[in-house]
Regions:
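Periplasmic-binding protein-like
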Residues: 36-44, 103-106, 138, 159-169, ...
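Short acidic capping loops at alpha-helix termini that bridge into adjacent secondary structure
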Residues: 100-101, 133-137, 187-192
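Hydrophobic alpha-helical segments within soluble ligand-binding/sensing domains
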Residues: 79-104, 120-124, 145-154, 173, ...
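Amphipathic helical "hinge" segments at domain boundaries
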Residues: 1-39, 108, 119-120, 124-127
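Flexible loop/turn connectors
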Residues: 151-262
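Flexible loop/hinge segments that line or gate small-molecule binding clefts
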Residues: 20-21, 42-89, 131, 171, ...
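Short, solvent-exposed amphipathic alpha-helices that sit
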Residues: 1-8, 86-89, 113-132, 147, ...
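An alpha-beta-alpha
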Residues: 88-129, 236, 240-254
Length: 262
């Protein structure tokens, strides 16, 4: 989507990762200061990256923050999504189906702001219903399906008796399905499962995955419009700080169709 928007406006899209910033401090900021780019969209700001924001503003480059954990940043146009509230909605859906022992497997380690936000949303939903949260219900995966598989295996090995699992994203949920199946636990008959993102493959999982649709394409389009407005010296019509809540998508993996209250 960003590529198409850039092409339509005669711009080139440059993708730069900040994963190695700890080894090469300031390299990304130096790229900005070199004036090699005309505008910048930062996706999923990490907690560790926040120290760069003031330096980026000082460079005078049009800037938009996009993704989770950006709404508390002042004086920068942001297109965010309330990942905490979205996780709360997902967990509340599982609770509405009769589940109280709901485990959570994150999509990454704690350095990502969205990891903490989704965990807080999951926890808030449980505590609002008077459910005491067991720390043993939480595991941390690391982006890919295999890590979700291993994290779910660790949960199962603890014998904490969870009847539902909220996965931090759909890819983690795919790994969880395999681990649950290998342990003889059927989804959703024995363990209900919720994902997050609604990636294209989610509808084709076995069983089809219930999830939260975050609409990154639409939000990315709005973020691009915010950036173009700055680059052209005009004002974007929408709010300079816009936040969305993901949409609940109910398929088979959560067990809603079973009408079973445990």
């Amino acid at each position: 989507m960003l590529f198409r928007s850039c092409h339509r406006h005669g711009l080139k899209l440059l993708i730069e990762s900040t994963e190695d910033e700890s080894r090469e401090p300031g390299s990304f900021v130096n790229l900005v200061r070199s004036r090699s780019i005309d505008g910048l969209i930062i996706v999923n700001l990490r907690t560790a990256d926040r120290g760069y924001l003031e330096r980026l503003r000082e460079a005078g480059i049009p800037l938009v923050l996009f993704g989770a954990g950006v709404m508390d940043v002042e004086d920068v146009p942001t297109m965010g999504y309330d990942t905490g509230k979205s996780a709360q909605v997902a967990t509340e859906h599982l609770i509405s189906l009769g589940h109280e022992r709901i485990a959570y497997v994150s999509f990454a380690q704690r350095e990502y702001h969205a990891v903490g936000e989704r965990e807080r949303g999951w926890r808030a939903a449980l505590e609002a219903r008077g459910i005491e949260v067991d720390p043993a219900w939480v595991e941390y995966a690391d982006i890919d399906a295999h890590s979700g598989y291993l994290a779910t295996q660790r949960l199962i090995a603890r014998n904490v008796g969870f009847t539902a699992l909220f996965a931090g994203n759909d890819t983690i949920a795919f790994g969880a399905i395999r681990a649950l199946n290998e342990a003889g636990l059927r989804v959703p008959h024995d363990v209900a499962l919720m994902g997050y993102d609604d990636i294209p493959l989610a509808a084709f999982a076995s069983p089809p995955l219930s999830t939260m649709r975050s609409n990154p394409v639409g939000h990315g389009r709005d973020a691009m419009q915010m950036l173009l407005a700055q680059m052209n010296g005009t004002t974007f019509q929408a709010d300079l700080q816009a936040e969305r809540v993901a949409q609940l998508v109910i398929r088979e993996s959560c067990g809603a169709y079973l009408r079973t209250v445990r």
